[in-house]
C-alpha cells in the first residue's frame, strides 16, 4: 500500500504547511479591518402589518 509509505508525501505536506505558516499567515494577520466594530445594541425595526383589501 503506497499510502503507508510516508517518504513521498510527508515532505510535501511539511513544506506546504511551512509555506502557509511562514509566508501567508503573517500577511493575513497583518490585515486590519476598515470598519470599526460597534458595540451598540442592534435592534430590529418594528414593522407594522400590512392590511390588504381582499374584497
UniProtKB/Swiss-Prot annotation:
> Which membrane topology describes this protein?
Single-pass membrane protein
Q: Which InterPro entries match?
A: ATP8_metazoa, ATPase_protein_8
* Similarity annotation: Belongs to the ATPase protein 8 family.
> Which keywords fit this entry according to its UniProt record?
ATP synthesis, CF(0), Hydrogen ion transport, Ion transport, Membrane, Mitochondrion, Transmembrane, Transmembrane helix, Transport
Which organism is this entry from? Petromyzon marinus
**What quaternary arrangement does the UniProt entry report?**
F-type ATPases have 2 components, CF(1) - the catalytic core - and CF(0) - the membrane proton channel.
Q: What is this protein called?
A: ATP synthase protein 8
Q: Name one GO cellular component term.
A: proton-transporting ATP synthase complex
Which molecular function GO terms apply here? proton transmembrane transporter activity
Q: Which domain of life is it from?
A: Eukaryota
What the protein does? Mitochondrial membrane ATP synthase (F(1)F(0) ATP synthase or Complex V) produces ATP from ADP in the presence of a proton gradient across the membrane which is generated by electron transport complexes of the respiratory chain. F-type ATPases consist of two structural domains, F(1) - containing the extramembraneous catalytic core and F(0) - containing the membrane proton channel, linked together by a central stalk and a peripheral stalk. During catalysis, ATP synthesis in the catalytic domain of F(1) is coupled via a rotary mechanism of the central stalk subunits to proton translocation.
* GO biological process terms, semicolon-separated: proton motive force-driven ATP synthesis
Amino acid at each position: 500500500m503506497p499510502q503507508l509509505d510516508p517518504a513521498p508525501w510527508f515532505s510535501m505536506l511539511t513544506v506546504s504547511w511551512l509555506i502557509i505558516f511562514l509566508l501567508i499567515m503573517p500577511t493575513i494577520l497583518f490585515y486590519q479591518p476598515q470598519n470599526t466594530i460597534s458595540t451598540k445594541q442592534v435592534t430590529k425595526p418594528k414593522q407594522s402589518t400590512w392590511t390588504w383589501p381582499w374584497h
